[in-house]
């Protein structure tokens, strides 16, 4: 999808006007360019919409593309160049690592960022506060806790008529102090449902778009975590990641007919997050094995360093939030700022030297990237295949033809 609009296109979440049941599918707000495709009305009862003809939308978008000044992107390893900006889709881009990455890419002038976020207003304010220029980003509603929302997000991204050159699966939930599991709209334990299953469906659906892109270096990046990698010190802090025989995942993780944990054990919020990150890293490798040779897409994962001040830790106990940043800064030396972590992820998105597929990237203290080793479980091809097949069934892709 060639970049066609010089101005920011924003999408409002379906929750503004739709009832809870069928909200994502039926909302008139999703997938229509505001100001062109919608007339908004307010009343004492809330916000209503009227759809108008979209033919003028396409005309104006095409006219905008015609006068836009193309930007030459860096040469690929083969020496090719493309006379357009790259388009990167980033989930969880309204804060933390996602926002920092979106900013780092947008600042180059060579990337347009599609920000997949649950809260439109939060994302809009965050982009403005970060100094991102209008026209460098598009906000599209995405709730990874709903598979319907994921599918609607994919449909709305396609309506933008931009290419999909890079997909970054970044968003995550972390509930380390939870005593009881919470669940997604589809009945999955929240951490695995959002961090793994939501992203699994998103990546599978957008793979065709990545494949059809003419960008010199197409990439799918899934953010990993050192906490799910048990060959590291951090990965051995209890509770350790362990997917076991996948009996919980095979049974649906609903906490009723099956355990809410992948290994079938008792619920533990911290372990659920770590297990989801193992699934992320296994999924990246399975994507590489199945599709890299056929599509030319680079599949990679990374751990950008410990962002000890990130909002990901907002549900931790106050004492942890107080002591964790200085501990990482002065004891482990693993601390990185959100800004630096964003630059590292942006490097994996765009650096011509980081095109190797199937790699888990990390950084030394001197900010030099290197290929890191994954734990035995996180690099087990048989377990990756099993996680893939079970995940297909859970998200409704078991009979899906690629």
UniProtKB/Swiss-Prot annotation:
UniProt record similarity statement: Belongs to the short-chain dehydrogenases/reductases (SDR) family. POR subfamily.
Gene Ontology biological process terms from the UniProt entry: chlorophyll biosynthetic process; photosynthesis
Catalytic activity: chlorophyllide a + NADP(+) = protochlorophyllide a + NADPH + H(+)
One CC-aspect GO term: chloroplast
The organism's place on the tree of life at top rank: Eukaryota
InterPro entries associated with the record: NAD(P)-bd_dom_sf, Prochl_reduct, SDR_fam
Major localization listed first in the record, in broad terms: plastid
Cell compartments where the protein resides: Plastid, Chloroplast
Pathway it works in: Porphyrin-containing compound metabolism; chlorophyll biosynthesis
Keywords, ordered alphabetically: Chlorophyll biosynthesis, Chloroplast, NADP, Oxidoreductase, Photosynthesis, Plastid, Transit peptide
Protein's job: Phototransformation of protochlorophyllide (Pchlide) to chlorophyllide (Chlide).
SUPFAM superfamilies: NAD(P)-binding Rossmann-fold domains
Protein name (record): Protochlorophyllide reductase B, chloroplastic
EC number: 1.3.1.33
């Amino acid at each position: 999808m060639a970049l066609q609009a010089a101005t920011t296109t924003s999408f409002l979440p379906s929750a503004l006007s739709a009832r809870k049941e069928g909200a994502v599918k039926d909302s008139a707000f999703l997938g229509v360019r505001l100001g062109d495709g919608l007339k908004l009305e307010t009343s004492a009862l809330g916000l209503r919409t009227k759809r108008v003809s979209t033919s003028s939308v396409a005309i104006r978008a095409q006219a905008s593309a015609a006068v836009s000044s193309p930007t030459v992107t860096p040469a690929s390893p083969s020496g090719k160049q493309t006379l357009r900006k790259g388009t990167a889709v980033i989930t969880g881009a309204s804060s933390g690592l996602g926002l920092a990455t979106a900013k780092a890419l947008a600042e180059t002038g060579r990337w347009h960022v599609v920000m997949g976020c649950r809260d439109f207003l939060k994302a809009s304010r965050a982009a403005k506060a970060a100094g991102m220029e209008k026209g460098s980003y598009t906000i599209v509603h995405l709730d990874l806790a709903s598979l319907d929302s994921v599918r609607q997000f994919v449909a709305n991204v396609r309506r933008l008529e931009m290419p999909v050159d890079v997909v970054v699966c970044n968003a995550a939930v972390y509930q380390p102090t939870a005593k009881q599991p919470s669940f997604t709209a589809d009945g999955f334990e929240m951490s695995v449902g959002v961090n793994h299953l939501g992203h699994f469906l998103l990546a599978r659906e957008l793979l065709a778009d990545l494949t059809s892109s003419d960008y010199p270096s197409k990439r799918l990046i899934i953010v990993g975590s050192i906490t799910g990698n048990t060959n590291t010190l951090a990965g051995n802090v209890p509770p350790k990641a362990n997917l076991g025989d996948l009996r919980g995942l095979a049974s649906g993780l609903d906490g009723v007919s099956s355990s809410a944990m992948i290994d079938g054990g008792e619920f533990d919020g911290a372990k659920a997050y770590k297990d989801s990150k193992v699934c992320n890293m296994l999924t990246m490798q399975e994507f590489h094995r199945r599709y890299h040779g056929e599509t030319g897409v680079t599949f990679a994962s990374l751990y950008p360093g410990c962002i000890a001040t990130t909002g990901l830790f907002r549900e931790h106990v106050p004492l942890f939030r107080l002591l964790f940043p200085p501990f990482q800064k002065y004891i482990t030396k693993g601390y990185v700022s959100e800004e630096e972590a964003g630059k590292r992820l942006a490097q994996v998105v765009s650096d011509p030297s980081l095109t190797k597929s199937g790699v888990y990237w990390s950084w030394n203290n001197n900010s030099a990237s290197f290929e890191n080793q994954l734990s035995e479980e996180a690099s087990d091809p048989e377990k990756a295949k099993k996680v893939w097949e079970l995940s297909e069934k859970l998200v409704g892709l078991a009979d899906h033809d690629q």
